[in-house]
């Protein structure tokens, strides 16, 4: 009797690593999770030790096997999904990183990004990479490491150093240095990759003086990249055959295969991605153009809007203001509110993301009266998440010319029914919550499984992650627009407040 086969997804996130084993029905059979330390050398800097990331991945692979009694030989293929943009540079011979991994949120390279803007490169970089110039992306992080580690530039030019985002680093480690690759979705977040020509861009590399020899080969999101070295996978030589950045993996896990399909992951922040098909559409409204996924010789482009504060606004109510004891409690408080929704919280704690990209804005509250209760405040904070999502969805409709009919949702805060209902109401469209909320890991598993024939084709996947619950809009049009206009006024006032503060500082 042949043993049952499975797919393993490695989900390497910002604060923890997970390994999840899925069966042929797309069900989670086993999982293991391990946190690793965050390093904050200075205010605004965020780094990771790349070896600690690797150790945590080794640990969770073992944990998933131990929990399930599944053997490495029963794993048909491995899919990898990862925190995007985070940058590792290591020695090609020894495999030792020459500096900590610089994490996507880290602002230490902001002066390099600022200089690129001042030198007038915004348009060129946007047209080639689909991105805005920002410290968020890998390009400035590589430049910073080459500038700050003695001798690094010279070693890079001699071909002694390799660069990779976390997907590349993990494949390199799992294959014991045999394979140096990345995938379309991760390459598209480096600010070095021409997403139209599908090549590393020589003009941008020259501008930043980054040697091309450092860069990994770019492959599709679903193909066999290499096999695990037996001693790194507990005796198994298993194909690594699926790879995607976390938000693109969630798009795939949500089965958003058609142009116009949109998913939103309500995590710490909120990441909204729309499949725009084989057309690369540059945003005129500060959304990012990126690659959703490339499979079977075809690339699917996407528009992306990032909201910095979503689930973390609920954590703020819990940890900062002590208004609630647990995050799920926010739903009961919001339902107990008797206000007429006249309170607005603008959670711009670290600035405003898409479509505003206002890094100076700070949080504010409007519409308070003597009658405002804790319940009203909690409700307004939850509603702020939904309002921000509408800001992005409205912008996507303008940029793409596509009428969005449904939003597919996942992530922790998607479990809040009150928030999902209000999201449906304020957008005026259906919200489809996935039955399996592990969409990021599932997306990586699907990509890996397709490459080795574990699942026959993309149609076979459509049965595997059906909608768990559908929330339909029930608010009347005039109320919906009145509430949203109030939100737009609150955002405007927030921005004016900071601008005036900046003007006061300049006058001193």
From Swiss-Prot:
GO cellular component: cytosol
Pathway(s) it belongs to: Polyol metabolism; glycerol degradation via glycerol kinase pathway; sn-glycerol 3-phosphate from glycerol: step 1/1
Keyword Phosphoprotein found: yes
Modified residues (Phosphohistidine): 232
GO molecular function, one term: glycerol kinase activity
Post-translational modification as stated in the protein's UniProt record: The phosphoenolpyruvate-dependent sugar phosphotransferase system (PTS), including enzyme I, and histidine-containing protein (HPr) are required for the phosphorylation, which leads to the activation of the enzyme.
Binding residues for ADP: 14, 18, 268, 311, 412, 416
Assigned EC number: 2.7.1.30
Name this protein carries in UniProt: Glycerol kinase
Catalytic activity: glycerol + ATP = sn-glycerol 3-phosphate + ADP + H(+)
